[in-house]
Amino acid sequence: MKKSLMMIAGLFFSVLSVAGQGLSMDRVNADFQKKKEALPTGDLFSVFRQQLTQEERDALTFFYAYMSVGDITDYSGDFYLENVRSSLTTRKETTWGKTIPDDIFVHFVLPIRINNENLDRARMVFHDELMPRVKGLSMLDAVLEVNHWCHEKVNYQPADARTSAPLATVKTAYGRCGEESTFLVAALRSVGIPARQVYTPRWAHTDDNHAWVEAWVDGKWYFLGACEPEPVLNLGWFNAPASRGMLMHTKVFGRYNGPEEVMYRTPRYTEINVIDNYAPTAKADVTIVDADGKPVADAKVEFKVYNYAEFYTVAS
């Protein structure tokens, strides 16, 4: 058995496939029809009977094609339509909106869900508060300003409960790294800036994990510590640890076909590897052989890092 791998700082992780480019609305529509057929009762798709522009219809179709059943049943169509309209309006009113490709917009601006938080009206609330602060700024400076705003609202405090919703995080004024990064992604998307939560499941240097944010600016992804403002992007306390990390990944809503390595696909999201943004990498091949030197078919390969007194599997 032969696997394609990528190496960083002497460690390996699995590369399962390489995605293509572009967004296929034909595929989105097909997935949407499957979702409708799977949920024939409850009138869960009634929002599509409203007067909608083609942009609104396409955006809602994308939402419903890849949302979980829980999100479809727990929140109304009007809730999703309000979020869609806010995102489309923001795209038109910002100077950077026209520079964002459609596939980046639908995967990294349009989606509401970031983690396992309850969904709320944060997009509209944050938009109204943040737009005056980012008006007239470049896209890069807007990212920095939004993070300053997040720092004003939320401080770090460790916790183990389910991820707090963005508006709940404002109310408590604290959150762990996963909540702070969820908060920053929600804030950036509210002003039309593509953003994604990045996660390393285990550090190589200490018994812990971490989550932070990447923002898309003028065609390139940059990282930043959530609610930890710095004067520039690609700077955080975790620069050195990330350069030694075994895996940095994010889950992208829908069928994403960007340039990053695809680790895993489900009917709802695409898990991608973004380790290239943190250290030089190289591809390597690992072949599993038996005692006679013959390749082993369907062998299970796991790549582990020592953390919390165990070898933790980060990819298999």
What function would you assign to each model-found segment?
Residues 1-24:
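Bacterial Sec-dependent N-terminal signal peptides
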Residues 22, 128-135, 142-148, 157-167, ...:
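Hydrophobic/aromatic-rich core segments of domains that either
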Residues 222, 307-315:
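Surface-exposed loop/edge segments in extracytoplasmic proteins
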Residues 286, 301, 315-316:
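Glycine-centered loop-to-beta-strand initiation motif
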Residues 291-309:
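Short, ordered, surface-exposed loop/turn motifs in non-cytosolic proteins
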Residues 282-290:
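A short, amphipathic beta-strand motif
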Residues 255-275:
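Short, compositionally biased P/S/T/A/G/V-rich stretches that sit at domain boundaries
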Residues 27-172, 207-208:
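Secondary-structure boundary elements
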